């Protein structure tokens, strides 16, 4: 590592180091970590978070079974509060949790190879257990709400047990969801009960609220699992850059020094949450948010209401709070980062610190840009300086930096505008067809059902994001698309798709989306032999519910393109028009299946001729 980079690296992380030293000093004051976490969270919250932790590791265990493990840990915590010098009180809390899991009787009978994790030493033991977590598993049913005529009475008679069952159910179904989020959802559910139990139709009231809560839980779970995936795959520095951009956009009035401290603190908390250390995750998240609330005048006036909420509700509220308005008098960055003759001297003297401040300054001026776009802009600017600062006339070399950076902006703006215009002008059905055509051509190896699922996710993103104002549309679109792409790349690791996908997935984090957008037809793909059975037509095309008919037609479209990914838009239209005419004709006949048998055979012959596919 260059000395310059090392020195600037130390400078950049000095605030984080001081914070970490403070944390170690704080922990050193407590001989027992479990005791001080228990004291911080108090009994009810500690119990709830312990239940979340066990439910996320042991997803098949019953509530009663996990309650015994929670009791063991709470008993130990209370013992350690009374006497921190007790021998078993000095262990790290995550080790205490995993030791408890490894003492479960017949662990292997229920969890098979997961039991082998117990033979490993920490932290490998925890990594092993994490690898066995199953997101939204088939063997776990969604939360089953008690009947409307008894739910209010059950809640009133035994609130703690009632909410405990809710927390348990959500945690085991969402094993990567952070504890603060789960407790926030439990509070939302409790508020819904308190409101709906006053209504004449309790069930209808709860149904409406539950739909919103389920969608919210699913969305937050997907995002948090994605954050953990980014941390694991790309490491601290990429995640740090993401956080710096996001927090600079959200709190543009806060000085760089304070935003940097918050970034470093948040990385530590996210790592705890991603590692399954939910008690530490909850405690340190609460402390971080309390620190933020104590500096509202520095960060934002938008979090005032959140900071007045109980600690269990505060974290999620702050995360969902609106961006603060950027200061009106921010000067242009051109003078400092392009026109200044000393740019190279500043860049070379403290590379990381210089780039971090550039990212902060650029981000706080552009809350309308996506995180990924700003990362591409920063990388483009950094690469330009690395090249230009080696020349005899650096200023002349980087004089057109603004134009080069604008290319990144235009590419992203054009992608968003093109897709939102398509959705607006033609509607969701045609938008989905367009997505399926594009991505089947890019990835014809992907199973039909998975392509349809991916297309639906992208259509949902379009519907959600394109209705937003220009100030949020890009960030919303590319943010969610990056999650879909990350999921595709994760699948690519275990089930390779093709060389183009592999190449895009190996790109820098911020370049993945443009790579997927620019990806062309997979020319190496060899279609399977034409099988007429894949294009069977029957009376369901007439009688099935509209949604089912639409799904069937989309699958036919995907399977058709898989036969020849190079087909043109004109060829697709010709075949689609033929299909529509066939359905219109046959659905009016008395013997529908006979008609489909004859007309379907003709359509297949015509389609093969259109595509130039031999017999």
From Swiss-Prot:
Subcellular location: Secreted
One GO term describing the cellular component: extracellular space
Cross-referenced PROSITE patterns: ALBUMIN_1 (PS00212), ALBUMIN_2 (PS51438)
Entry comment describing in which tissues the protein is expressed: Plasma.
Record: glycosylation sites: 500
Limits of the Albumin domain: 22-214, 215-407, 408-605
Binding-site list for Cu cation: 30
Amino-acid positions noted as binding Ca(2+) 2 in the UniProt annotation, renumbered to this chain: 40, 283
Disulfide bridges in this chain: 80-89, 102-118, 117-128, 152-197, 196-205, 228-274, 273-281, 293-307, 306-317, 344-389, 388-397, 420-466, 465-476, 489-505, 504-515, 542-587, 586-595
Annotated binding of Ca(2+) 1, by residue: 33, 272, 277, 280
Classification via Gene3D superfamilies: 1.10.246.10
Signal peptide (from-to): 1-18
Single Gene Ontology MF annotation: small molecule binding
Keywords noted in UniProt: Allergen, Calcium, Copper, Disulfide bond, Glycoprotein, Lipid-binding, Metal-binding, Repeat, Secreted, Signal, Zinc
GO biological process, one term: response to virus
InterPro entries: ALB/AFP/VDB, Serum_albumin-like, Serum_albumin/AFP/Afamin, Serum_albumin_CS, Serum_albumin_N
Primary location class: secreted
Family as reported in the entry's similarity comment: Belongs to the ALB/AFP/VDB family.
Function, in words: Binds water, Ca(2+), Na(+), K(+), fatty acids, hormones, bilirubin and drugs. Its main function is the regulation of the colloidal osmotic pressure of blood.
Identification of the protein by name: Albumin
């Amino acid at each position: 590592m260059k000395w310059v980079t090392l020195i600037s690296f130390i400078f950049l992380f000095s605030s984080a180091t001081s914070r970490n030293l403070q944390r170690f000093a704080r922990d050193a004051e407590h001989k027992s970590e479990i005791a001080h976490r228990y004291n911080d969270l108090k009994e009810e919250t500690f119990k709830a978070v312990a239940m979340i932790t066990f439910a996320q590791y042991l997803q098949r265990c019953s509530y009663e079974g996990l309650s015994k493990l929670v009791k063991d840990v709470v008993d130990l915590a209370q013992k350690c509060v009374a006497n921190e010098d007790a021998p078993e009180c000095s262990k790290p809390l995550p080790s205490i949790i995993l030791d408890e899991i490894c003492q479960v009787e017949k662990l292997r009978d229920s969890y098979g190879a997961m039991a082998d994790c117990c033979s490993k030493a920490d932290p490998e033991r925890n990594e092993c257990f994490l690898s066995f977590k199953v997101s939204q598993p088939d063997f776990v049913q969604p939360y089953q709400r008690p009947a409307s005529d008894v739910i209010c009475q059950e809640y009133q008679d035994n609130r703690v047990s009632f909410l405990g069952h809710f927390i348990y159910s959500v945690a085991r179904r969402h094993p990567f969801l952070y504890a603060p989020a789960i407790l926030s959802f439990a509070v939302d559910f409790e508020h819904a009960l308190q409101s709906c139990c006053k209504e004449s139709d309790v069930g209808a009231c709860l149904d409406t609220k539950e739909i919103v809560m389920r969608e919210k839980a699913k969305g937050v779970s997907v995002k948090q699992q994605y954050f953990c995936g980014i941390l694991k795959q790309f490491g601290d520095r990429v995640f740090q850059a993401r956080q710096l951009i996001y927090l600079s956009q959200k709190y543009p009035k806060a000085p760089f020094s304070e935003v940097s401290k918050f970034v470093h603190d948040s990385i530590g908390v996210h790592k705890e949450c991603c590692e399954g250390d939910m008690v530490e995750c909850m405690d340190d998240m609460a402390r971080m948010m309390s620190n933020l609330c104590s500096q509202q005048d520095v960060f934002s006036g938008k979090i005032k209401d959140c900071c007045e909420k109980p600690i269990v509700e505060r974290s999620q509220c702050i995360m969902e709070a609106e961006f603060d308005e950027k200061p009106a008098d921010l000067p242009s960055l051109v003078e400092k980062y392009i026109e200044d003759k000393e740019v190279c001297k500043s860049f070379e003297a403290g590379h990381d610190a210089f780039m971090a401040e550039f990212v902060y300054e650029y981000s706080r001026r552009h809350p309308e840009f996506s995180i990924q776009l700003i990362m591409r802009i920063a990388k483009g600017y950094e690469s330009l300086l690395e090249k230009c600062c080696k020349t005899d006339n650096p200023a002349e070399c980087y004089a057109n930096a603004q134009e080069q950076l604008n290319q990144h902006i235009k590419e992203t703006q054009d992608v968003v505008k093109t897709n939102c215009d398509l959705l607006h002008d033609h509607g969701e059905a045609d938008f989905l067809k367009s997505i399926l055509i594009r991505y089947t051509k890019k990835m014809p190896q992907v199973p039909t059902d998975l392509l349809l699922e991916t297309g639906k996710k992208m259509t949902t993103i379009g519907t959600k994001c394109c209705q937003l104002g220009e100030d949020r549309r890009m960030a919303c679109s590319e943010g969610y698309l990056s999650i879909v792409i990350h999921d595709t790349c994760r699948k690519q690791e275990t089930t390779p798709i093709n060389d183009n996908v592999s190449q895009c997935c190996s790109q820098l984090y911020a370049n993945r989306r443009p790579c997927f957008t620019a990806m062309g037809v997979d020319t190496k793909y060899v279609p399977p032999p034409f099988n007429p059975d894949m294009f069977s037509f029957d009376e369901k095309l007439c009688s099935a519910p509209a949604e089912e008919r639409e799904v069937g037609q989309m699958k036919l479209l995907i399977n058709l393109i898989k036969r020849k990914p190079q087909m043109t838009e004109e060829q697709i239209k010709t075949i689609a028009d033929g299909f529509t005419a066939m359905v219109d004709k046959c659905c009016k006949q008395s013997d529908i299946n006979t008609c489909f048998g004859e007309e379907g055979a003709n359509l297949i012959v015509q389609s093969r001729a259109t595509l130039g596919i031999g017999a």
